[in-house]
Amino acid sequence: MIQAIYDGMWDKFIIASDRNEYELDKHLIDLESDTRRGITALTYLKQGSGSTLDEIVKFQTAVQEIEPKQYYHPLDELHLTVLSVISCIPAFELNEINTKSYADVFHSVLRSSPPIEVKYQGVTASPNCIVVQGFPVNDALEKLRNNLRTQLTDAGLRVTFDSRYKLVTAHSSIVRFRLPISDGQLLLALCQQYRNHKFGRIVFTDFELVFNNWYQNLAVTKSLASHS
């Protein structure tokens, strides 16, 4: 199922490349005016081995050499979204919710959750971004997501998860398109070279519940709870 989702993205990317019909994110031109904020449970890739991160950065750098004007997620902001608890909403503020209640549920669920291991192999893309494909090695991530969904809902807390789509993948976004692509076919060829590239594996043991903007920029992010 996860591979089918990645393949569906890839098919749309090929069409966008052939037609030069990319979806450019104008918010990335002026981040300071973007007021969209949300609540997310996540884990950062930086806790992984150096070799895996080096491989990801190597690919990201290769893209940057041919498309220097796009947006590149910094290494320390690369993340795996466990659950988008409240999807980013314009002008959303922390004083609208009881953050302790969310933190309590987060801690309750994570206490009984094992580490999450993800295999990173291949890249896929869409008309608006490029991601590294992640594949959980077992059902621990799925169980964690479902437990968070259940307990947050049972607690009667404000949530919007699964409003756009039910999160089942383990991808990490690394490039977003904000300006016209200068050479779509060259970019496509590079992505094809890495379509099945083995980046490595990461065992995630540290998790956070954060208040964030759309791009998980650390300058905006506020940690509400952490578990390790």
What are these regions, as identified by a protein language model?
Residues 1-228:
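Histidine-dependent nucleotide/RNA phosphoesterase domain, centered on the 2H-phosphoesterase fold
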